[in-house]
Amino acid sequence: MAPVAADSVLSTTDRRLVAALQWDGRLTAERAAKVLDLSPATVRRRLHALTADGTVRVVISPVARPRNGGSAGALFLRIRVLRGKLDTIVAALAAREDIPFIDVTTTGDEIFAVARTEPGSRDPLVFRQLPSTQAVTSLESATILHVFRLTSEWRHDVLRPAERAALSPAEPDPGPLAAGSPGPYGVDTDPLEQSLLDALTPDARLSAAALAARTGHPETTVRRRLAQLTLQGRLVTQVLVDPRRIGLPIEAKLLLHVAPDHLAAAGQALADHPAVHGAFATSGLSNLHAAAYFPDLAALYAFLSRDLVGLGITHVETALVGRAAKRTPPLGPVPPSPAVTRRRRPASAGQGKG
């Protein structure tokens, strides 16, 4: 990953605000000020500065953990290409809607990607299109079998235990499921809930008033449903920020061989590690995949030589990410949303015009 000038790393206050938003994406300035021992004016000013230029975005998580513990079925792809053909292959992959994440390693000829697919299906990308491309020299695919840690669940480790406890949400109350079509988290949604989630997807910090204006629903109804979604743990937000801006310029992909009787414990240990932002049990020779952020190479070495000891890991392959070629949603300012016109209610009987 390219070096970042020291002055581009966010201040301690800003990094603490980023971490607070990871715990509660809709955190108010007043509550953040109380928990972090800052003035509300400072919090409002810094949050505006961070979000106005796209340094930080809070979105509805595109990959959330369904209630049945799923999120399995997606494919990890490891693609090696001819030198000089990397950008062409990356561009072709990035154009596909079923590939939300693409990373290019520092070797300059290797791509890691995630492809959404149906479990057990013979995805044409893997079985026909990529293998027939002359620029591709090798292709490995592994199916996600179990999720230990999602990126939306990762928290930047800069808050004190008491602050984390104050910001941690209460244990979700499942409550009754809404009748409707499958929602983004593997549960059903009704039209009201789906319209709110759609409006919040690019900017999860929209106020209830703004949501009411965009969706055409009464503000009291919006507030009530938001509270219900939060209580049920279904309003899953994710903070988008370049990890280099929070002092973590090193990202590593880890492909691990773990003895079967240690797989569950090793996966959970990785999920609990503050550096790890993704951990999955997979098919293939490397049956545990992880992704982690580090402040420097010394920290990565300490992780490999100390933190992985005793987990039943028999082999580790480490790849450094040189460039995040695609993220869904992308980093940057919130895209403009089309205006939603509120439907006019028909005049009731006996109501005059004008």
Where are these regions (language model features)?
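A compositional/biophysical signature of low hydrophobicity enriched in polar/charged and small residues
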Residues: 1-354
